[in-house]
């Protein structure tokens, strides 16, 4: 380890920044956020420095660097475009045993500035030791996506509760269990983010007063249509907090690779070598694991409330008194149509869109007359086996036999394939694709060649 990570308390402590340009301005902003008593020395200053000085936030010393400016300083930063001046500052600081950072010259510096993720009071610092600042920045961007913006409020509120929690729960194990429930309580986190004091108080009192049983919870998460980049940030956060993930065939391998490595995985879909797990058995798996105290994520392709049976699963949990929450996902109709260059609505072609399941319960029948109307787009989920019947019924009820149609196979993934034609060909086209595929019927399909942007294998 070439550098020891430390966090400095600089509030009201004297610090010197040498430089008055854009780079120095960025360093000044960080020092001011940390509460430093900042002096800035330069031959000339960018306008922002003058504005800060006018507000009394820092002191400006215009002119050549003089080592006496380091007197009584705790920390210094050299951020000029003159290597000789930067070296002069570094040597003067070293002689006084003052830590000094030299921008873009880590070998001359006694400390380096990391990339920072600020969720005050929670702080995350990332450094490559000065060898690759771009890599550190890219890692910071990835972590920024994982850490919710409201995390700082949660951490700050936890600090306020520490004494009361210690008084309420006498044993270390009880306090640990309380904090585990506290930090994964999504309702509390959202209430803190919204500054909803009444809700925060109500949830806190419930957490403090209810028995510390081993009851877990279930989070229903929509994984989106396939491309892992379309998984929502909240969905990603939830699957990385899960003790167990119950998933089906429509969840891509790329998304499953994002699951916490030590989490249990239970596959409940249907594919080669596996039998489809009945819905009632899935419901019982969720219930059983939550009753064991697990944080369960039920991960479904697309959006769990659009032909995903999410409501059925939650009813079982609700009846059993198991806490649950829902993270919506991008449904297949939205994701697959976008990646296939097919706008679902368009002023000239479609003023509405209908999402339709290819499976009706107990032999039910669609309202084919209204489905055959113009100026709309039809999207059939799970409709491959019914494609010939869909073709026949739509034509029978008056739809133009030359209505454009498209089938999107493995939409949004690198395996995406789009097969297009007209309504009279729908049954035959369905024989050329495999599940999972989406059927799209409407005039908007004619725009595909013009609007297609996604390159796939």
UniProtKB/Swiss-Prot annotation:
Binding site for S-adenosyl-L-methionine: 225, 301-303, 306, 331-332, 382, 411
Keyword terms: Cobalamin biosynthesis, Lyase, Methyltransferase, Multifunctional enzyme, NAD, Oxidoreductase, Phosphoprotein, Porphyrin biosynthesis, S-adenosyl-L-methionine, Transferase
The organism's place on the tree of life at top rank: Bacteria
Active site: 248, 270
Gene that specifies this protein: cysG2
Binding-site residues, NAD(+): 22-23, 43-44
Protein name as it appears in the record: Siroheme synthase 2
Biological pathway: Cofactor biosynthesis; adenosylcobalamin biosynthesis; precorrin-2 from uroporphyrinogen III: step 1/1; Cofactor biosynthesis; adenosylcobalamin biosynthesis; sirohydrochlorin from precorrin-2: step 1/1; Porphyrin-containing compound metabolism; siroheme biosynthesis; precorrin-2 from uroporphyrinogen III: step 1/1; Porphyrin-containing compound metabolism; siroheme biosynthesis; siroheme from sirohydrochlorin: step 1/1
């Amino acid at each position: 380890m070439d550098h020891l990570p430390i966090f400095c308390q600089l509030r009201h402590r004297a610090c010197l920044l040498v430089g008055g340009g854009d780079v120095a301005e960025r360093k000044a902003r960080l020092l001011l956020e940390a509460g430093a008593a900042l002096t800035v020395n330069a031959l000339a200053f960018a306008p922002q420095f003058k504005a800060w000085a006018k507000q009394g936030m820092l002191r400006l010393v215009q002119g050549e660097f003089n080592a006496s400016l380091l007197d009584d300083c705790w920390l210094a930063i050299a951020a000029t475009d003159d290597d000789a001046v930067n070296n002069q500052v570094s040597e003067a600081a070293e002689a006084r045993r003052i830590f000094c950072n030299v921008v873009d010259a880590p070998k001359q510096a006694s400390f380096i500035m990391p990339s920072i993720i600020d969720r005050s009071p929670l702080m995350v610092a990332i450094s490559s030791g000065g060898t690759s600042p771009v890599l550190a920045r890219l890692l910071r961007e990835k972590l920024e996506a994982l850490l919710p913006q409201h995390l700082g409020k949660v951490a700050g509120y936890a600090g306020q509760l520490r004494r009361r929690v210690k008084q309420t729960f006498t044993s270390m194990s009880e306090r640990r269990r309380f904090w585990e429930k506290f930090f994964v309580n999504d309702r509390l986190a959202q209430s803190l983010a919204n500054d909803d004091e009444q809700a925060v108080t109500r949830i806190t009192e419930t957490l403090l007063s209810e028995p510390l049983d081993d009851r877990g919870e279930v989070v229903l998460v929509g994984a989106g249509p396939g491309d892992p980049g379309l998984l929502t940030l909240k969905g990603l956060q939830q699957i990385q907090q899960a003790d167990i993930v119950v998933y089906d065939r429509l969840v891509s391998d790329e998304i499953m690779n994002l699951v916490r490595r030590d989490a249990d995985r239970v596959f409940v879909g249907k594919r080669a070598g596996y039998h489809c797990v009945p819905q009632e058995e899935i419901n019982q798996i969720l219930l059983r694991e939550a009753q064991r105290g697990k944080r369960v994520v039920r991960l479904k392709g697309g959006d769990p409330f659009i032909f995903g049976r999410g409501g059925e699963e939650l009813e079982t949990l609700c009846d059993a008194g198991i806490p649950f929450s829902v993270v919506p996902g991008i449904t297949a109709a939205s994701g697959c149509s976008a990646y296939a260059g097919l706008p679902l609505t368009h002023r000239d072609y479609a003023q509405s869109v209908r999402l339709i399941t290819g499976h009706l319960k107990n032999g039910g029948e669609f309202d084919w007359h209204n489905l055959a109307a113009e100026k709309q787009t039809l999207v059939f989920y799970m409709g491959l086996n019914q494609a010939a019947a869909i073709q026949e019924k739509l034509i029978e009820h008056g739809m133009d036999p030359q209505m454009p149609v498209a089938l999107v196979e493995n939409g949004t993934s690198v395996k995406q394939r789009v097969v297009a034609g007209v309504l009279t060909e729908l049954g035959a086209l369905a024989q050329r694709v495999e599940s999972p595929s989406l059927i799209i019927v409407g005039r908007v399909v004619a725009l595909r060649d013009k609007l297609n942007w996604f390159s796939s294998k």
